[in-house]
Swiss-Prot record:
Entry binding sites for Mg(2+): T26
Reported function: GTP hydrolase that promotes the GTP-dependent binding of aminoacyl-tRNA to the A-site of ribosomes during protein biosynthesis.
InterPro entries, alphabetized: EF-Tu_GTP-bd (IPR041709), EF-Tu_GTPase (IPR050055), EFTu-like_2 (IPR004161), EFTU_2 (IPR033720), G_TR_CS (IPR031157), P-loop_NTPase (IPR027417), Small_GTP-bd (IPR005225), T_Tr_GTP-bd_dom (IPR000795)
Ranges for region G2: 60-64
Pfam families (alphabetical): GTP_EFTU, GTP_EFTU_D2, GTP_EFTU_D3
Organism placement in taxonomy: Bacteria, Bacillati, Bacillota, Bacilli, Bacillales
Full protein name: Elongation factor Tu
């Protein structure tokens, strides 16, 4: 049979393997590519090729991540696998690897372990919306009742963190046996991917989301009005749209976009990814500033207090050399601006060491346009000392 051409026309989904160390995440990743390669949907990648993940220096932090791609009959997937636990924490908090869904790998021989719990919590905090479970190493467990027990444990754990534990697909297999080409176990990999296809929805495209553009610069054009420039983060903006100016002010201002310009050309509309200048009706030069956002009316609000999942850079990564304590007041960099904020640590936590990851409550001195999942960095005098993601809005 001739190899099917690698089509780009299929919907694209980003997924990743998560779970405890040595439960078989990387072996499963290798097994998926190897099994799908037989149907022409992937390039087979061995365990060693994936395990030797290159270290990526993403914004000064070192993250080891393996990226593989493959396709099923209906979709094209980009799949990330991280060798170390710290790599997951960094990856998920900085959004270096955005996941539309995760495959949670749990060894049937060991059951859920500390990092199983941690990765589920992390997925919840950073907004990985869907999880499918692969119970691995089932060839090592003869007792059917034991398998059912482990499955129940995993489902309970998922429910505990707000995932629909009872409804999540759980596939029992053996990544190693599938990798070695045993047909019965290969079938389990096919079954896993069929569940991933069916259970993890195709993400909404950036252009289908409500319009949002962080303001980078503002200038006035004599006789025309005020122009805000920036890169459209999501959605589409058309001439004539009513938008809100959000953040750094007591209340949102509303205005109409009377012109959209890109590379000095006038456009009817701009979309996610475009760098534009938006001409705003009736807005004075001093009514809008860098750090605010332009957004579709009612789509996003300004908030000052929120809970966040944060990881603090180690000394080696260019971070602080000393711990910080409650009431620490660094700058929080959201999109295009720094805002000072005060940190509250969880009960029982006295201090945070460089290299830690922790949930904290942050109160900014001025409200800013944020939502659950908004990423930020923590800075001191222009130097980045940590990264975070908004987990829940408090007020």
């Amino acid at each position: 049979m001739a190899k099917a051409k690698f089509e780009r026309s299929k919907p694209h989904v980003n997924i990743g393997t998560i779970g405890h160390v040595d439960h078989g995440k990387t072996t499963l990743t290798a097994a998926i590519t190897t099994v799908l390669a037989k149907a022409g949907g992937a390039e087979a990648r061995g365990y060693d090729q994936i395990d030797a993940a290159p270290e990526e220096r993403e914004r000064g932090i070192t993250i080891s991540t393996a990226h593989v791609e493959y396709e099923t009959e209906t979709r094209h997937y980009a799949h990330v696998d991280c060798p170390g636990h710290a790599d997951y924490v960094k990856n998920m908090i900085t959004g270096a690897a955005q996941m539309d869904g995760g495959i949670l790998v749990v060894s049937a021989a060991d059951g859920p372990m500390p990092q199983t719990r941690e990765h589920i919590l992390l997925s919840r905090q950073v907004g990985v919306p869907y999880i499918v479970v692969f119970l691995n190493k089932c060839d090592m467990v003869d007792d059917e009742e034991l398998l059912e027990l482990v499955e129940m444990e995993v489902r309970d754990l998922l429910s505990e963190y707000g995932f629909p534990g009872d409804d999540i697909p759980v596939i029992k297999g053996s990544a190693l046996k599938a990798l070695q080409g045993e047909a019965d176990w290969e079938a389990k990999i096919i079954e896993l991917m069929a569940e991933v296809d069916a259970y993890i929805p195709t993400p909404e495209r950036e252009t289908d989301k409500p319009f949002l553009m962080p303001v980078e610069d503002v200038f006035s054009i004599t006789g025309r009005g005020t122009v805000a420039t920036g890169r459209v983060e999501r959605g589409i903006v058309k001439v004539g749209d009513v938008v809100e100016i959000i953040g750094l002010a007591e209340e949102n201002a509303s205005t109409t976009v009377t012109g959209v310009e890109m590379f000095r050309k006038l456009l009817d509309q701009a979309q996610a990814g475009d760098n534009i200048g938006a001409l705003l009706r009736g807005v004075a030069r001093e009514d809008i500033q860098r750090g605010q956002v332009l957004a579709k009316s009612g789509s996003v609000k300004a908030h000052a207090k929120f809970k966040a999942e944060v990881f603090v850079l180690s000394k080696e990564e260019g971070g602080r050399h000393t711990p910080f304590f409650a009431n620490y007041r660094p700058q929080f960099y959201f999109r295009t601006t720094d805002v000072t904020g005060i940190i509250q640590l969880p009960e029982g936590t006295e201090m945070v060491m460089p290299g830690d990851n922790i949930e904290m409550t942050i109160e900014l001195i001025a409200p800013i346009a944020i939502e659950e999942g908004t990423k930020f960095s923590i800075r001191e005098g222009g130097r980045t000392v940590g990264y975070g993601v908004v987990a829940t809005i408090v007020e």
